[in-house]
Design a protein with these regions (language model features):
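His/Asp/Glu-enriched short active-site or ligand-binding loop at hydrolase and phosphoryl-transfer sites
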Residues: 132, 257-281, 330
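Short helices/loops that flank or line small-molecule/ion binding pockets
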Residues: 155-163, 284-293
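Bacterial Sec-exported substrate-binding components of ABC uptake systems
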Residues: 51-66, 71, 78-114, 213-243, ...
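Gram-positive cell-envelope targeting signals
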Residues: 1-85
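A short, structured surface patch at a secondary-structure boundary
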Residues: 106-161, 165-171, 270-273
Length: 365
């Protein structure tokens, strides 16, 4: 028996033809799911197969062609819904926040240098529509508009660039700034790194965000292969190194055991003189450096050759092995300063520095 129009119109759960139709099938034996011109579309779950019936205003079944038309429309709606669901992306950022996009990001503002380098390494440079003021690598990125970053982040500048996503560091922006961005429809994704494993996590996160999972995995594999090769070559090399992140004039800062710099030292067969300190980054004194007497000094201060000259001439440092033997290295291209895919290059530079001078071995690359 065909359900009458009057019987179905009294139902409260009237829903449009589309995704909700499937849900309705599971809840009702028969239901009203839409009003095509001149008739009503019903389904009847009590039949052996789901049976669609269109009844016109006089209560008579309408043509099979019209039924076929509505079936086709239903299939289109269902396929569209499935495609939208398949293209949606959900990531959990490195601050534990779940972020969902309807599709991979195509317009992104990146606030910190390391994340920009990750984006470029996985082939997403064209998606960058804005950059923080310290984002300067690769050189081709310098044509991208700059926005204020850190405590002075200008939300209006960012919104004017119409990004889908802002990628930032957990220490860089305030909760209020994040709230403003999200209230204006911009997704905020937080990336924060201190050791090599967290760099891998950031690469994976950003790769998923951009729909570039395979490219992200390839970057990680390349880094791991380089690290493994250098570590194998460095077996038995037992020297110590001091990483200077902030120069004496601003207060000495160095790297502890939970930092990627400590891991770079280990990869190259060296001991970080502050490996007994758990913090990734820590304030240190001249007395501590002198007492621990490093064989090598690596500067990540951004002061160039002037920084090397200043360290070599420091009063009271003359008995340090690295000073006596003039084994002070400056990170000219900042690859050691940034937890990005270029840590691979940092490991190569460090290996080449200590081995070309110390052991005369062939460079790593």
């Amino acid at each position: 028996m065909k359900p009458s129009r009057e019987t179905c119109l009294h139902r409260e759960n009237i829903i449009p033809l589309g995704v909700g139709y499937a849900r309705k099938l599971a809840e009702e034996p028969a239901g009203f799911v839409g009003v095509p011109q001149g008739g009503t579309l019903f389904y009847c779950k009590t039949l052996p197969l789901i049976h669609l019936i269109i009844i016109n205003e006089e209560g008579h079944s309408m043509s099979k062609k019209l039924v076929s038309l509505f079936l086709a429309v239903l299939m289109i709606f269902s396929m569209t819904a499935v495609m939208a669901e398949d293209s949606a992306i959900t990531v959990t950022d490195m601050f534990g926040r779940e972020v969902t996009l309807s599709e991979p990001a195509t317009r992104i503002v990146v606030m910190q240098p390391s994340d920009c380098e990750i984006l470029c390494a996985i082939g997403c440079e064209d998606a960058i529509v804005g950059r923080g003021q310290y984002v300067d690598y690769p050189e081709s990125i310098l044509d991208v508009p700059v926005v204020q970053s850190g405590a002075e982040t200008n939300v209006e500048e960012i919104l004017a660039l119409e990004p889908q996503v802002v990628l930032l560091n957990s220490m860089s922006q305030s909760e209020e700034q994040v709230k403003q961005l999200e209230e204006n429809g911009v997704k905020v994704v937080v990336s924060t790194t201190s050791n090599i494993e967290s760099v891998y996590t950031a690469i994976t996160l950003i790769g998923k965000l951009m729909g570039k999972d395979a490219e992200a995995e390839a970057v990680i594999t390349d880094m791991q292969t380089t690290f493994d090769d250098i570590k194998a070559k460095s077996a038995g090399f037992d020297k110590s190194v001091y990483f200077e992140i902030s120069p004496l004039q601003w207060g000495l800062y160095s790297a502890g055991s939970s930092s990627y710099m400590n891991e770079l030292a280990e990869i190259c067969g060296m001991r970080n003189i502050f490996a007994d300190q758990e913090d990734a980054w820590l304030s240190v004194s001249e007395e501590q450096v002198i007492e621990r007497n490093p064989d090598f000094i690596v500067l990540i201060t951004g002061m160039g050759s002037e920084g090397v000259d200043e360290v070599l001439s420091r009063e009271g440092w003359g008995d340090i092995n690295a000073i006596k033997n003039q084994k002070v290295f400056n990170d000219d291209d900042s690859c050691m300063a940034r937890p990005s895919p270029r840590l691979k290059d940092a490991a190569i530079e460090l290996y080449n520095f200590v081995n070309e001078i110390e052991a005369g071995e062939e460079p790593a690359a």
